[in-house]
């Protein structure tokens, strides 16, 4: 399925019973969060609040609130098909030279997909049907959600922030939360390693004290939105990846006030700049950890132009203790990561980021172990190969007879195959998510790897235990007579 814009996607969701229109008046202050949270935890539909209290623009929440809807947004029918997306990314990250004509022929589908990567630049777009500039800009007219009662202010959550470094060939798309502090002012909260922050730092070094241009898109098509949260190779733009997912080139249009290209399909666009000398204290906000984060100074985004469709939809979400929408996205994108990791480490059988681990803070890996110390090599690989895992605090490595997605299996492996002193690897002074207040220093903390594999010669001096196995002939015999035993017959 190809979705040219958000509305195409919503039409499909509605046909499949995956979208609920809410006509009753609902307040963006706390009430939408409460409804969205209850709905997501029950595995419910996307929500379109058509009558937000005090506003004329409807609010879309819980769009990617189930793994199925994430898969649909990527043009797949179910989550398992996302591994095909991962295989494509693995191919693009490290393409292999064809060894024969047969290899070249088998690679043609992937190369045909690559042809859809360039963007298609339009001269005009629906996202610029209505234009407010300078003094006309009033962000308070947008139904920006105030998610939790102790949040300091309303928060823009699903904005696709578009930036470009002065020496970069391509633009960067990233999603960073933005605190509303004035009619035309937002605080841009991006961490120093993220693409937008790196572009900004490069700009400040190359053009000191000059305003840094920014555009933010709200309500783009699902492929573009998901392209901004997927681990695309550094050499591939998010727009190009969205084109691969969609099967058609991503349509863009030039911003009104700068040279940045914005998604033509977007519902609402914010354009403006960051003054390198202007910062403001951000937060506190309830975030994906389930706690309120610390306050810190971040750059201020001054909005000079607000453009939109004639009948826009405001796309929003909330973050809180898992499960929340970021956790669901992490669970679905887990399937994308697996082929990328397996291309570098073929011994990996499965890789799992439990949603309750705040999307990325704990990983369970199962491997076909081949030598002593193998588990430790895989730990180091997980932490270093993809930057998405630089903040993963715990990596548990198990053998391939363990189901990485079954905590009972994993706990059994840890308690029977690992010794705390021998099998726990602790690395200090490593990068840690700034939001992780458990670390002793903001942004710097430790990591732990647990080797829960069977030990080989060189790893133990003792005879290793042999797992209990059932007799196959007995299992078959009992299978045949099980129903007749009536052990679980109704009382």
UniProtKB/Swiss-Prot annotation:
Pathway: Cofactor biosynthesis; ubiquinone biosynthesis. It is a peripheral membrane protein. Pfam families: UbiD, UbiD_C, UbiD_N. One of its GO terms (biological process) is ubiquinone biosynthetic process. Binds 1 prenylated FMN per subunit. The active site is at 287 (proton donor). InterPro entries: UbiD (IPR002830), UbiD-like_C (IPR049381), UbiD-like_N (IPR049383), UbiD_bacteria (IPR023677), UbiD_Rift_dom (IPR048304). Prenylated FMN binds at residues 175-177, 189-191, 194-195. GO terms for molecular function: 3-octaprenyl-4-hydroxybenzoate carboxy-lyase activity; metal ion binding. Keywords: Cell membrane, Decarboxylase, Flavoprotein, FMN, Lyase, Manganese, Membrane, Metal-binding, Ubiquinone biosynthesis. Its cofactor is prenylated FMN; Mn(2+). Its EC number is 4.1.1.98. GO terms for cellular component: cytosol; plasma membrane. Mn(2+) binds at residues 172, 238. It is found in: Cell membrane. It catalyses: a 4-hydroxy-3-(all-trans-polyprenyl)benzoate + H(+) = a 2-(all-trans-polyprenyl)phenol + CO2. Catalyzes the decarboxylation of 3-octaprenyl-4-hydroxy benzoate to 2-octaprenylphenol, an intermediate step in ubiquinone biosynthesis. Homohexamer. Belongs to the UbiD family. HAMAP family: UbiD (MF_01636). This is 3-octaprenyl-4-hydroxybenzoate carboxy-lyase. The lineage of its organism: Bacteria, Pseudomonadati, Pseudomonadota, Gammaproteobacteria, Pasteurellales. The gene is ubiD.
